[in-house]
Amino acid sequence: MENGIYAKFNTGKGSILVKLTHDLTPGTVGNFVALAEGNMENKVKPQGQKFYDGLTFHRVIPDFMIQGGCPKGTGTGDPGYKFDDEFHPSLKHDRPGVLAMANSGPASNGSQFYITHVPTSWLDGKHTVFGHVIEGQDVVDAVAQGDNLDSVEIIRVGEEAQNWNAIEAFVGLKGARLKRDAA
């Protein structure tokens, strides 16, 4: 694997390996990684417990996407906080296997994510893209509604990735909003 930060989604249908875009969307990746590793304070699971492990893919639309990350399993749950969108011009819904944040409108990101089956350009500028599938798109295509997300394993390759601090990256995104709101 190339240097970088990866998320391995382990399901009963197999594994999905995603390269995360921590260099382009650091706050969003910081939130995801910190939740996955159990380091993010939230209102659902105690700190130290991995947030995504044992959740389900609560929404699956064939030929569109699979969605997970809802602690209630209904699409209405979140970690007890919301955060800003983080768009980057080079990150588009331009292929199958795009990992992005599910939301209910601007600045309503929490823990829910989706992975696409096909290009979905109408979602550009509405949902933060923060990774791409590099192995296991066949697993994405096989996941059915209600399937378990057994675990999410974060893999760090290279010195920069090893030293990257997910919490600091997320706090930086929140800090940027506070500065913008104060201006």
What kind of region is each of these model predictions?
Residues M1-A183:
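Cyclophilin-like peptidyl-prolyl cis-trans isomerases
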